[in-house]
Amino acid sequence: ANDLVDDK
C-alpha cells in the first residue's frame, strides 16, 4: 500500500 492509495 503506497501513499497514493488509501486502502482502508
Swiss-Prot record:
This is Unknown protein 11.
